C-alpha cells in the first residue's frame, strides 16, 4: 500500500498532542462550567482552510490552528478536544481500492498506542447531501486517562478528495458535544478552482 499515507509517526504525534489536551482538561475540579462555555461559544463559528486539498470547514470561534510539529495535513484544537485531518486523492489509488477500508486502516493504526480499546455504539446525526460521512467511536485508555477517539471518514460525491478526521477528548466532553463535532464535519466543503 505504497500510495496509502498511513503514518504511524503522525499517529504517535497525534496521541502526544491529545495527551497534552487531556492534561489541560484534567486539571482537577468541576469542568462542567468549561463545557457550558464551549457550548455557548459554539454559536459563533470561524472558517479554516486546508489549501493543499482545497478544503474549507468551520469550527467554534475558540478553536485554534496548531500545525507546528505535525505530519497531519491539519491539526486544530480548543482547550478540550483535538482534531486531526489526513487528506487523500481517490486518483492516487487503484480503481478497486475501497475508500472506507483505507480510512478504517488509518484508524486501526492510530489506535495501536492505546490500551483497552473498545468500539462504542454511537449513531451520528449527519444529514449531508454532497458527501458520504462514515463515523466510528472508540473508547480507550492513554497514560492513565480514559479517552474517546471519534473517527469520521468524509467522501465527496463529486470530488477526488477524501478525508480521515479524528477528534480526541475525554468521554464527558465528547458526549455533550457530538452535535457540534458533527456540525464541523458537515461543514466540510471543497472549493472549486484549486490545484491538486
Task: Describe these PLM feature segments.
Residues 69-164:
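Conserved polar/disulfide-associated segments of primarily extracytoplasmic proteins
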Residues 2-77, 145-146, 168-196:
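N-terminal targeting sequences that direct proteins away from the cytosol to non-cytosolic compartments
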Amino acid at each position: 500500500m505504497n500510495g496509502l499515507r498511513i503514518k504511524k509517526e503522525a499517529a504517535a504525534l497525534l496521541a502526544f498532542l491529545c495527551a497534552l489536551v487531556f492534561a489541560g482538561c484534567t486539571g482537577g475540579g468541576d469542568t462542567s462550567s468549561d463545557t457550558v462555555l464551549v457550548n455557548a461559544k459554539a454559536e459563533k463559528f470561524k472558517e479554516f482552510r486546508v489549501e493543499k486539498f482545497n478544503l474549507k470547514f468551520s469550527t467554534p470561534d475558540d478553536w485554534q490552528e496548531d500545525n507546528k510539529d505535525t505530519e497531519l495535513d491539519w491539526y486544530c484544537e480548543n482547550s478540550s478536544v483535538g482534531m486531526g485531518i489526513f487528506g487523500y486523492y481517490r486518483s492516487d489509488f487503484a480503481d478497486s481500492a475501497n475508500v472506507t477500508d483505507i480510512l478504517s486502516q488509518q484508524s486501526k493504526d492510530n489506535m495501536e498506542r492505546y490500551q483497552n480499546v473498545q468500539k462504542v455504539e454511537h449513531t451520528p446525526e449527519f444529514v449531508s447531501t454532497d458527501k458520504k460521512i462514515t463515523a466510528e467511536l472508540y473508547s480507550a485508555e492513554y497514560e492513565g486517562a480514559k479517552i474517546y477517539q471519534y473517527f469520521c471518514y468524509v467522501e465527496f460525491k463529486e470530488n477526488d478528495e477524501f478525508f480521515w478526521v479524528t477528534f480526541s477528548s475525554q468521554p464527558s466532553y465528547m458526549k455533550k458535544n457530538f452535535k457540534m463535532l458533527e456540525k464541523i464535519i458537515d461543514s466540510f466543503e471543497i472549493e472549486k478552482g484549486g490545484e491538486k
